[in-house]
């Protein structure tokens, strides 16, 4: 299969599609499962994903211009450099409509997004941009956040237990009620310009 010829697909499974660099526009997917598909540098323009799952897919540099997501899950996917700010998000969100498990999210951008309860678990999100985002009650458990950017980010009641390599300035982010593992939480003191000794 080289292209989606219908305008909508329901409860279908797509396996091992090779669609890198292709443009898919105005297609609705509901209850669909994408497994081991290659969408690297592809473009989903004004598409709608409802209750969909992506598993072991290559989504590097995927362009999601004006597409919509609801109750969608990404598991064990490569998603480097995806700009999530291009997605058409609902104006009011009580919980993030996407979840990430065991994904590579390096260099992804979530800049300025309102995504409360976002799940980024067991992921690598090196150099990801979370600045000015509302990620209250998000979960970053067991994720590598080396070089990830947090500034003016709402992280109240977020869960960073067993996350690694994060740098969060406690003066420029809202972290009230957030959970941290004891050892890694020492990195929060970096913004205090103090010297620790045993």
Task: Indicate where each model-derived feature is located.
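Tandem repeat scaffolds
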Residues: 1-198
């Amino acid at each position: 299969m080289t292209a989606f010829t219908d305008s909508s697909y329901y409860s279908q499974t797509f396996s091992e599609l090779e669609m890198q660099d292709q443009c898919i526009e105005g297609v609705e997917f509901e209850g669909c499962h994408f497994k081991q598909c290659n969408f690297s540098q592809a473009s989903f323009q004004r598409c709608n994903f409802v209750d969909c799952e992506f598993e072991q897919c290559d989504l590097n540099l995927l362009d999601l211009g004006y597409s919509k997501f609801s109750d969608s899950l990404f598991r064990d996917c490569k998603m480097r450099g995806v700009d999530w700010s291009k997605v058409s998000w609902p104006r009011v969100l009580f919980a993030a409509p996407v979840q990430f498990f065991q994904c590579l999210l390096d260099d992804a951008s979530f800049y300025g997004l309102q995504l409360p309860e976002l799940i980024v678990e067991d992921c690598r999100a090196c150099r990801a941009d979370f600045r000015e985002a509302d990620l209250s009650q998000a979960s970053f458990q067991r994720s590598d956040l080396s070089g990830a950017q947090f500034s003016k980010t709402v992280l109240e009641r977020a869960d960073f237990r067993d996350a690694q390599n994060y740098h969060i300035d406690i003066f420029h982010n809202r972290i009230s009620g957030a959970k941290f593992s004891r050892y890694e939480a020492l990195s929060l003191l970096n913004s205090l310009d103090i010297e620790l000794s045993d």
